[in-house]
């Protein structure tokens, strides 16, 4: 490992155009999981693959679903408008009341369903993966949430500003924003911040970059550890000078375009599959959550300081094709022992993952901004993959 280096990660807010689309797609997944049980539909039977495009006062939703007939286009449109309202868009070019919403959802392909659905009771075949693919999980002990420091603090900056905006404290700031932090590492540990970038939409057209900095700098300083910002830290606040037109009115958004922001900020590999808009039969989502869960529990158990874990699946096949672990020279036991231990400690079939992490719930909209990982598990079952309740089982399996 290099003794000294810089590493940079970025985050975007819930008002970023792509994140607006992620939020809408996940709200629709949640809608099916909320309404299914009311209509007597088994949550295990719910299917959703929902993509969203947002541009100037226009939202297009397309995809495949299976769920209750009670989920009508009118129901979906209401949920979409409420999501846009909650984010904070009431601009001429993108307004929750006036945006044209086009819904193009249709039933899931029977060819896909036949490989994904569990067969009738009494058969010896299991529910298969919803697609082929590779998924990665990662954990490191460099932050309390076992996340890489650059993405951890990039998210934290924007979360603090968002909370202030929603509280009414920062009424002049709009929903759309981005952050980026360049962290200085010494001996593999984060020790300071070299560069800070915040681009934030403002609702008063003639605000200057300096005026925006006066608003956002306190939250940046609150987010970062004491002593990390020095007189050598370089600030870039609204470096283009103006950010009045924001959100989908300024830049078209699509679901699934912020996969590095959603995960580890580039500090770990990514299998390429996006999360939002997908029910948990899609291993792009559920197996990525399981990979993070396992990597985090390995680090939490003290079995490694860093851990990268890969799972691989084939469509219609239940068991993972491979399990790969790399502890980057920090492991207290060999990687092959860890690979055997995780296979013993958790059922890694799609059904096993959904059951272990309790994923058949309306818990997805909350994941759509500020990262799917490094979050706090909540009482409703959200972020269950961030628990460290498997650490003891892994120790026993070694």
From Swiss-Prot:
Entry GO terms, CC: cytoplasm
EC number: 2.5.1.6
Predominant location: cytoplasm
Keyword Transport tagged: no
UniProt catalytic activity: L-methionine + ATP + H2O = S-adenosyl-L-methionine + phosphate + diphosphate
Binding site for Mg(2+): 18
The family this protein is said to belong to: Belongs to the AdoMet synthase family.
Assembly behavior: Homotetramer; dimer of dimers.
Entry protein name: S-adenosylmethionine synthase 2
